[in-house]
Amino acid sequence: MIGKERIRIRLKAYDYRVLDQSTGEIVDTARRTGAQIAGPIPLPTVKNKYCVLRSPHVDKKSREAFEIRTHKRLLDILEPTQQTVDALMKLDLPAGVDVEIKAFGKEHK
């Protein structure tokens, strides 16, 4: 890949430890192939809260509250080489990590 191209990678996971491990693997792989990295940038954590009745029939006052947090990271790989793209495609990330990859060409700023 030639020019001012970049790859933007967004990672999402419920467990921040697995997310940080996956981010580290991607950063190490990209640096080994000679690409420049911008990030990892931690994005705001989304907290979803759910309230459930404890009793199946009565007692509206008795409730159970649950919370699930979605942690996010953003990585930009600047001026990736073909070797970088091949290494990222072969990378095996743990389950539970959602990876979204977008490639931008010269026209995007």
Swiss-Prot record:
The keyword Ribonucleoprotein applies. Gene3D superfamilies: Ribosomal protein S10 domain. Disulfide bonds: none annotated. The keyword Ribonucleoprotein applies. Keywords: Ribonucleoprotein, Ribosomal protein. It comes from the Bacteria. GO terms for molecular function: structural constituent of ribosome; tRNA binding. GO terms for biological process: translation. SUPFAM superfamilies: Ribosomal protein S10. One of its GO terms (cellular component) is ribonucleoprotein complex. Belongs to the universal ribosomal protein uS10 family. Part of the 30S ribosomal subunit. Involved in the binding of tRNA to the ribosomes. This is Small ribosomal subunit protein uS10. It comes from Koribacter versatilis (strain Ellin345).
